[in-house]
């Protein structure tokens, strides 16, 4: 996605930061040509921060699950607010530590003084309190346990009306140069608002709204579903996620794959839940321009389901756009979509692509061949989002 003006973002990180609230803005902004520096106090480029998934798993309060790590790409001590257009602070427990760090609090205050954008999520609004930014009635939202602290800090609490469940949480709020969200369920709208606030304009070659269907199941790759799903929402696309044996409002468990030190292959860890947004029987191929199959282990479930295989074949018969990430290529292989196509592939999918009649491209993280867009793994999502958006006729200009 071409950008006439280079934009830059600073991502303030720390151990146990919320994984979605870190990875989604990082990958989405990178795919749109925004430079993103990831920093953490007392750590340098090349060091890593632990990330966690936070979700409600049947208990009274959310559960925190350690999922993987993010490698920093810049040094905290080199940061100058004037070099950035926005600072993004994910949620997570790390903000409790950073709110007592004078250098971090001063950094946030300097962004505010410079009238730079500040984007907070879930619990990271504590950084605004520490910097004295909310005094004077700044409108703000957050995870509800933060409400009394926002009000005690002189802020004005805002909450999306009519919410009965997490499935219905979609909105966020902006007051001046301050953007706040209740957490990762609102990232579609939050990223849209962030792009607009950075001067981004979504341009489409098509007159009608692009529509995309994600095929998922239990143990779908966490970032492989959430990052493109939220990104396409931010671009104004109609986006649905379905699975054969669950109805709208039910959830699929996700998995994160973390390459731990000394291991030959990544370890699988439980990630967030992902809400199914439509019931299978309500899906009509004619309503969508593209079908996306994320990776993880869910493609093994889908390839054994006749309804899922038949649906993909119906997309093929109507010459739609196909996209797959990692193991998602398994379902495309079983339906003949990969025959004669060049496909981005890691080592684990090389044989599968070959027996399906495709050409495994090992040296590129993302490949587009005609109407088939493939990514080798979830780490290739920035390039994948660029290629998928291009295939849908969408660009973002700053």
From Swiss-Prot:
The lineage of its organism: Eukaryota, Viridiplantae, Streptophyta, Embryophyta, Tracheophyta. Residues 7-199, 210-393 form the PfpI endopeptidase domain. One of its GO terms (cellular component) is Golgi apparatus. Induction: By ethylene, abscisic acid (ABA) and dark. This is DJ-1 protein homolog E. Belongs to the peptidase C56 family. Coiled coil: none annotated. May be involved in oxidative stress response. Homotrimer. Pfam families: DJ-1_PfpI. Disulfide bonds: none annotated. InterPro entries: C56_PfpI-like, Class_I_gatase-like, DJ-1/PfpI. Keywords: Repeat, Stress response. It comes from the Eukaryota. Expressed in roots and cauline leaves.
